Amino acid sequence: MAEFLQQCGSWGVLATLAAYAAGVWVNRKTGKALFNPLLMGSIFVIVFLSCFGVPYADYKASAQPVSWLLMPATVSLAIPLYEKWELLEKNLAAIFASIAAGVLTSLGSVLAMAWVLRLERAHAVSFLPKSVTTAIGMDVAETLGGTAALAGAVIILTGIVGSLLGETVCKVCRITDPLAKGLALGTSAHAIGTSKALQMGEIEGAMSGLAIAVAGIMTALLAPVAANFLP
């Protein structure tokens, strides 16, 4: 089967799209947030590769066009931000302070976990960019000596958890301001959280999209500094 797929060119793209479509179908059929389309799609791809004995490296190479689309997809999130530009100008200081606090909290939590669990450095640095989009996080992890695949898995898991629990946490903490909710989701759960923020409202989506970009830049700059404090 692996040899047959190698002759099919971009079979990985088709497999990825089919798995995601199946994940969307399962999510709509069940109506449960737990059955997140991205989570279900990932499971379907893993099962497919395992059943047919296809190496992950072959799948990754074949699905490369999907990875290339990550960056323009992330950039496109600036569109709702442009539509809410006046809101950004009015709350500029508070917005950037909030994102900075989120980034420092994310890095600090990884440092604490690394010290408590005595994680290997290669694993710990792969966790540092867990709250930024994969387009940035995987490169940051590799630059610091981590594993891109592990970083990607942790980033996706972080996004799924943030998407599932973000709105509930806001309700429990009585956070009602749409700007605050959007910044929280974008800073902690990157693009996956932003998809949830867009469902919550225009302001939430715009602020979450901004948080992805700013948090990504801050993490890329601060992660090497944080890595110096790893055990």
Model segments located where?
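Helical membrane-embedded segments and adjacent short helical loop/helix-boundary regions
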Residues: A2-T16, Y20-Y82, L87-A94, S98, ...
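Short alpha-helical transmembrane interface motifs in multi-pass membrane proteins
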Residues: Q7-C8, Y59, A93-I95, R121-A122, ...
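Entry/N-cap segments of selected transmembrane alpha helices
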Residues: W11-T16, L87-V110, G152-V161, A211-G216
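Small-residue-rich segments of transmembrane alpha-helices in multi-pass membrane proteins
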Residues: L39-C51, M71-S76, A97-V110, L128-M138, ...
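Helix-loop-helix hairpins and the membrane-proximal interhelical loops
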Residues: P80-L92, W115-V116, D139-L157, N228-F229
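Transmembrane alpha-helices that form the ion-translocation and gating core
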Residues: A97-A135, T158-C173
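Alpha-helical membrane segments and immediately flanking helix-loop junctions
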Residues: H123-L150, V154-L157, V172-V214
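Juxtamembrane boundary at the C-terminal end of a transmembrane helix
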Residues: L221-P231
